[in-house]
Amino acid sequence: EITLIGEDSSVAGLEVGQKLTAKQLLYAMLLPSGNDAAYTIAVASARKFKENDKLPAKEAIEVFAELMNDAATELGAEHSHFTNPDGFHDKNHYTTALDMVKIASYAKSIPLISEICGTYQITQKLKSGEEFYWVNSNKLLNQGEDCYSEYADGMKTGFTDEAGSCVISSFTKNGKTMLTVAMNSPELYGKYYDTLILAKLGFKQNKIDCSY
C-alpha cells in the first residue's frame, strides 16, 4: 500500500516488510506527515472493516474513503468529500474550514490523537527492529521558531499546490481549547502567523489572556 502514495509525497520513511504498532503508525502519519503511514492505516482499517485480509490495496482505499465520508457526515461536515487518506489533490476531494474544525474537534477529543498531535519529536523502535526519529511538521510546537507558542498543542499541517499551505491548530490555556484553521497561505510561515492572530482573537473573545 505504501507504493500507492503520490509523487513528491511527504513520508515517514517506511518500507515494505517493516512491522509497526497502530500507535507507531499514527506517530508516523501525524508528526512528519507520512503519507506512507496514512495509506498503511487506511488499507489495514478497510481490510478489518471488510473482514478480508486479502482485499487489494486499491479497493481498500476506496472502502476507506467511503468510511471517511460516512464519518464526516456523522460529524456534520456536510460540505466535504474525501477520495484518499492523504489529502492529495483530486477534483472530488474537498472540504471547508468549518468542516475541518468539526472533524478536528472530534479528533482532539480522542486522548491518543491529542497526545500525538501535541508531540514535537519522538524516537520509536519498530516491532521489526528499525529505529525512527520523527519531528512534527507543525512549527508552532518548535521552540526554535519565531512562531512557537507555549499554548499550542496540535494539530496538523497540510500542503498541495492547489490548496496552498494549510494548518489546523489547537491552543489550550486555563482549561480552554481553541481550534483555528488557516488555508491557502502563499507562504510556509504565513499560515502560522495568521493562526497566532486567530488564536489571540479567539481567546480574547472568551476573556482569556493570551500573549505570545
Residues covered by each model-derived region:
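Penicillin-recognizing serine hydrolase domain
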Residues: 16, 46-212
